[in-house]
Amino acid sequence: MYDSSQEQRICLGSSEKIKSDNLRLQHQLFNLYDLINIIDSYSQEYVLTPFFNDNIDKIDWRFLSLNMNAIDILTKNRDKIDWDNLCANPCAIELLRENPDKINWIIVNGNLNGIDLLKENPSKIDWVYLSDNTNPNSIDILKENHSKIHWGILSQNPSAIDILKNNIDKINWRALSLNPSALDFLKENPDRIDWRFIQMNPNPDAISMLLEHPEHKIDWFYVSKNPGAINLLVNNPDKVNWDTLTVNKNSSHLLDLYPDKIDWSYLSEQENAIDLIMKYPSKIDWKTVWRNSNIFKLRSFNEFL
């Protein structure tokens, strides 16, 4: 069963208080609880891995502003931030709160973690974008405002399956066919399935369901970019659409077998492909790679000593 929680990302805090904490370590007596908290805050700072730190002069701030592990660097370089892109960054909420005049509210409505900002500024809610937001708190707001829901958008929201089951007459079945949390519901209503759209559904069970109905022709353009279809793609390399495979977040081991087929602009931003990216450093796209969260690592406490 597809678990939508796997898309929820943990955002670690900024390290702006490092200097003051160092003073506490050097000049103050503190209890064990203080020490544990300080060590924990240090262990949560992200820094560039050595290779990318050596190429820091190539930073593209527009793409870096989208990188959820780049908050520490962005906080120290606020004049270089692309604020529209930052509004889409799920780990940038505190930085946005500190700069309300820079907020693009339409983009924040689609930000997984933007719900607290919207609760503080309810007049800024855009109901179309909020209908696409998978945060459970967004779903709670939508439940309380049925008349404002965009049902076409909500139909593909994996966190909204309970609302949809209670409002079957409002479902957009084409959009629902994309919903990774709707497979059981779709199986109960096979005549409503859009068999072209279900080929883009990232739930692996969607591909199994497709294969159980050979009367519906596989569209390899759509299937090739589906992360839930990777086993099917591995077994049918002659049918893969290589242009769309590169955007598939689970495709790196297959692409590794066919490096001449890679679109490096797309691959460079793929988190799961960092090992493949580092295998061909001369191929890196030095714009899109700065969006890749795995160009960062957690700094160890020893690096502060």
Segments (PLM) and residue ranges:
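Alpha-helical scaffold segments
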Residues: 7-305
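Extended intrinsically disordered, low-complexity segments enriched in serine/proline/acidic residues
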Residues: 1-7
